[in-house]
Amino acid sequence: MSLDIQSLDIQCEELSDARWAELLPLLQQCQVVRLDDCGLTEARCKDISSALRVNPALAELNLRSNELGDVGVHCVLQGLQTPSCKIQKLSLQNCCLTGAGCGVLSSTLRTLPTLQELHLSDNLLGDAGLQLLCEGLLDPQCRLEKLQLEYCSLSAASCEPLASVLRAKPDFKELTVSNNDINEAGVRVLCQGLKDSPCQLEALKLESCGVTSDNCRDLCGIVASKASLRELALGSNKLGDVGMAELCPGLLHPSSRLRTLWIWECGITAKGCGDLCRVLRAKESLKELSLAGNELGDEGARLLCETLLEPGCQLESLWVKSCSFTAACCSHFSSVLAQNRFLLELQISNNRLEDAGVRELCQGLGQPGSVLRVLWLADCDVSDSSCSSLAATLLANHSLRELDLSNNCLGDAGILQLVESVRQPGCLLEQLVLYDIYWSEEMEDRLQALEKDKPSLRVIS
């Protein structure tokens, strides 16, 4: 539990009656109330409602992962329907809300002009519930800016009501509808709504929505026309290389200032990677890129690394987990690690880099100019024979703060070499992640002693 005079933050705690009685006065005065996965019941929703009625300071209420149901949510919302309520953020994610409960929520939105964020993911709202919700969102008194609707059982039929909201609300900034089967037709309707909207959208998240390569032309227009757009999440959609070719002209548009692009598991190969590299070279604004789960291969890795060495590329975070890389591409990544002055985070797990590849990476990391702070090498077929190189690198490199070696074939001999380096004052590593690695009791004692002797370090296993 986290508690100060302004916030109450409790997660994953079954609250006894005595504990609940202790917390009730705090619900009446805290600006931020988070009761995440606390086993709240309908009866306690009535207590929450009563407390909120007399709490004019409340700015954020998070009740996610409690089985409130429609009746419980109704009770809570009644507590917010007071003239003094100034709530800005409401999270009812995974609260067993259904479409039937959306009518009350819709009515409440009309009475909360200060509400800016609404999180409703993981509730079975359905198209009928979404229609009711949008009626409230369209009210002039509603000034919502951010709406999250992941896993809400929506179809393409929900996209026209959402498009109407986008057209009507110039203050709208973020829309998340990931993991709903809105498919190609629904995405096209949303894009048309955004095209017609004066809103300054900052984030659009459409992961696992059935987006196709044909939709990428529509999305290209959105990226080009919305200079405010900073994040575009399209992961787990069948875009393919054709889709990337359609999307990239929008990303290259002079007005595009996209910062984050998530296109993991999109069926992209080295060919599509080539189109994307043109964007990376031209757009200093692009800082975060996920290509995880695409079959880029070593050729795709080479293209990416050559681009990362270009002065126009200022990428800070690159996720290329599960991209079918081998040790053959590691010399290219080594050059990037040695020379690139912007890349801070590299997720390259679940690629067959093997010991030879990791040794190549260590050569780059050991150079004086290396700035990388986080490196994920989980499940890369690394063995104890790589650990001498890794150990030397940890002493030579003064930027690396987190290293993940989970699910590799390491034993006591390799881990001992890492421990001997990490325990040195000159090693600045703060987090060593070793999930699914097995060692002796003696090594367990060494790791516990290491954490005790060096409080700045966490060993996670």
From Swiss-Prot:
Mutagenesis or variant effect for residue 264 to A: Substantially decreased binding affinity for RNASE2. Binding affinity decreased 5000-fold over the wild type for RNASE2
Localization of this protein: Cytoplasm; Nucleus
Modified residues (N-acetylserine): 2
Cytoplasm found in the keyword field: yes
Region 2 X 5 AA tandem repeats of S-L-D-I-Q: start-end pairs: 2-11
Highest taxon above the source species: Eukaryota
Positions of post-translational Phosphoserine modification: 91
UniProt keyword Methyltransferase present: no
Single GO cellular component term: cytoplasm
UniProt KW keywords: Acetylation, Cytoplasm, Disease variant, Leucine-rich repeat, Nucleus, Phosphoprotein, Repeat
Recorded consequence of changing residue 93 to H: In IIAE12; uncertain significance
GO molecular function: ribonuclease inhibitor activity
Residue stretches of each LRR repeat: 20-48, 49-76, 77-105, 106-133, 134-162, 163-190, 191-219, 220-247, 248-276, 277-304, 305-333, 334-361, 362-390, 391-418, 419-447
Listed GO biological process terms: cell migration; mRNA catabolic process; regulation of angiogenesis; regulation of Arp2/3 complex-mediated actin nucleation; tRNA stabilization
Main location: cytoplasm
Outcome reported for the amino acid change (mutating residue 296 to P): In IIAE12; uncertain significance
Post-translational modification note: The N-terminus is blocked. At least 30 of the 32 cysteine residues are in the reduced form.
Modified residues (Phosphothreonine): 82
SMART domains in alphabetical order: LRR_CC, LRR_RI
Domain notes: The LRR domain forms a horseshoe-shaped structure that interacts tightly with target RNases via a large protein interaction surface on its interior side.
Function field: Ribonuclease inhibitor which inhibits RNASE1, RNASE2 and angiogenin (ANG). May play a role in redox homeostasis. Required to inhibit the cytotoxic tRNA ribonuclease activity of ANG in the cytoplasm in absence of stress. Relocates to the nucleus in response to stress, relieving inhibition of ANG in the cytoplasm, and inhibiting the angiogenic activity of ANG in the nucleus.
Subunit: Forms high-affinity heterodimers with RNASE1, ANG and RNASE2.
Pathological condition linked to this protein in its record: Encephalitis, acute, infection-induced, 12: An autosomal recessive disorder apparent in infancy or early childhood, and characterized by acute encephalopathy triggered by viral infections and febrile illness. Neurologic features of the acute episodes include seizures, hemiplegia, decreased consciousness, hypotonia, abnormal posturing, feeding problems, and respiratory insufficiency. Disease severity is variable, ranging from death to normal neurologic outcomes.
Protein name listed in UniProt: Ribonuclease inhibitor
Species: Homo sapiens (Human)
